[in-house]
Amino acid sequence: PSTSACCYASIHTGVPPQVHGILSNENRFRVEQPDIFSEVSKAGGKTGAVTHSYWSEFFRAYPFDLVEDMEYDEPAGPITHGRFHTMTGYNLKNQMTPSDVDLFATLTMLTKRHAIDYGILHTCTLDSMGHRFGHDCHEMDHACYAMDGMLAAFLPRWRDAGYEVIVTADHGQTDRGHHGGHDDEMQDFALYYFGAAKGPEADTLLDQLQLAPTVLSRLGVEIPSTMKAKVFLR
């Protein structure tokens, strides 16, 4: 399903929801399969996450403790440096989303202060705007424009620091602001890569399950046997 939590777990484990078991946003627990965080940490690397709290629940510990888990630095943990938000109280009139520039700055801080080897930044802004307004509208045009400008200010800094960058999404969305099904507009989304690797042709249709093994391969980390999808960057 093109549901957020299901996609989060698949992006990092490289297995479908039917295998990792996260089948809805309400069905959450610490997943059992190896994931990007666990494998990078096992290989001696440092990881960082600036994301919704679901990522902490799936890849560190469930349930999420609002006080203890909002920020942590754990040298021995799968997520070495975590900075999270919950969006508690979210509804169509109050999105409860942090400013994206704050998230970009926080991830950049982790790269500078802790020299993380792998980091993920997750924002719900465009998803929430789509749910509220749909897509063919001035509000969404401006949201995409604003996000683009914020990202443009940080992307060169990450590249100058030696990082390869993948910009993508967990799912698509209909013009009514819905996702969760199997229609192309719910499942298809863009992927942009900034780095030295060679990738497929621009119109290639990739599988979301390819992300985890591809990221590990770029980091020089052994890919676990559970991640069976083909690496797409060389």
Each PLM stretch: what is its role?
Residues 1-115, 217, 230-233:
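Active-site-proximal alpha/beta segments of enzymes that process anionic O-linked groups
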Residues 51-54, 121-125, 168-171:
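Short, well-ordered beta-to-alpha junction loops that form the rim of enzyme active sites
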Residues 7, 32-36, 103, 136, ...:
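Stable alpha-helical elements in mature extracytoplasmic
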Residues 16, 124-129, 196-197:
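Short connector loops/turns at beta-strand edges and beta->alpha or beta->beta junctions
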Residues 143-184, 191, 215:
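Metal-dependent active-site segment of extracytoplasmic phospho-/sulfohydrolases and closely related
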Residues 56-61, 127-131, 174-177:
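Short catalytic/ligand-binding loop motif for oxyanion handling, primarily in non-cytosolic enzymes
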Residues 6-8, 12, 181-222:
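Substrate-binding rim/cap in mid-to-C-terminal beta-strand-loop elements of soluble/periplasmic
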